[in-house]
Amino acid sequence: MVLLSFSLRFIAFTLTITLTQIADGFQSRMLMNNGLALSPQMGWNSWNHFQCNINETLIKQTADAMVSSGLSAIGYKYINIDDCWGELKRDSQGSLVAKASTFPSGIKALSDYVHSKGLKLGIYSDAGTLTCSQTMPGSLGHEEQDAKTFASWGIDYLKYDNCENTGTSPRERYPKMSKALLNSGRSIFFSLCEWGQEDPATWAGDIGNSWRTTGDIQDNWKSMTLIADQNDRWASYARPGSWNDPDMLEVGNGGMTKEEYMSHFSIWALAKAPLLIGCDLRSMDKVTFELLSNKEVIAVNQDKLGIQGKKVKKEGDLEVWAGPLSKKRVAVILWNRGSASANITARWAEIGLNSSDIVNARDLWEHSTYSCVKKQLSALVEPHACKMYTLTRRKA
């Protein structure tokens, strides 16, 4: 009887632990299944161009420009406020407060304005005691309260940074905000920004909708190419609902040439990276708009198959990047990272096609089609430029 009683207690204990693990696992995956980020997020973020020089007028004007330019109609929906929007001290109730001098109407009024334009409003906080600017408090230890505050303001997106983190692992800090958002009563996109320090691709898919794989991007060729390579390492972890994030776009900020920005946008699109514009939308020039509004390139990024393309071939400075698309298509980039024009070739076996396949090759930047291409695709590519294609198999 004693043995039977012990056995029953052990079984009950084991069952309790197992059910708890199942429940915890289910809860951890619920945020990923919040119905958001079925394709990579598209929108705008204030940091790259404005850093702390932000106010509610700028955010409203940016929302206006997103609509009037036509960018919102092709998928750019998030207007994301980055660091420096809040007061240094919380209020008497312990809540975050919008900075009176720059956001006098408050975040709720701003959210209402952005929503009235058919857009979504994002905001920024930090999994530490202060944000990275050290001008406002972080959310560490205030996750539930801040998540409810964000929800009450109508926030749609949270970028969650990693400064002033007390030396605690992000694996301990980030799930707390994930659960808080889950319990906030509002579906809020959760963007983890721990700079790839603890390989978030391997664990963040159960916690958030995207995760930074790298440090901050800079508006220059060296930074952009380095980050593209670092992000490529984690390609197999991306999936609908959870994406690798190599940081925001620098297109239009002036530090690179047109060809370099074209390469930047093309690689980000193929890599299923978030397409978050980082320039001043109110004054972007024609070239910037044409790059950011290329519907054919954007379609690769937003393809419903949701498989991240990656580097498949490297010969010195000449590279081939490729990835599968829906309807058995393939996206291909021929990228010249060198200083002289060069021919680049992608052979069918290198990009997932059969040697017998005959394809139509659609040039996504020239908006032209090459019919009945066999065995390989070649092009002369200018320095720091790329060619981007979608390949569609022809029926026998």
From Swiss-Prot:
Indicate whether Magnesium appears among the record's keywords. no
Q: Where in the cell is it found?
A: Secreted, Cell wall; Secreted, Extracellular space, Apoplast
Q: Cellular component GO terms, alphabetically?
A: apoplast; plant-type cell wall; secretory vesicle
Q: Where is the signal peptide?
A: 1-25
Q: Report the induction information.
A: By Verticillium longisporum (VL43), in apoplasm.
**Which cysteines bridge via disulfide bonds?**
52-84, 132-163
**GO MF entries:** alpha-galactosidase activity
List of residues binding substrate: 82-83, 159, 194-198, 212, 216
Q: What is the predominant subcellular site recorded for this chain?
A: secreted
State the source organism's domain of life: Eukaryota
Q: Which reaction does it catalyse?
A: Hydrolysis of terminal, non-reducing alpha-D-galactose residues in alpha-D-galactosides, including galactose oligosaccharides, galactomannans and galactolipids
This chain's protein is named Alpha-galactosidase 2
**This protein's encoding gene:** AGAL2
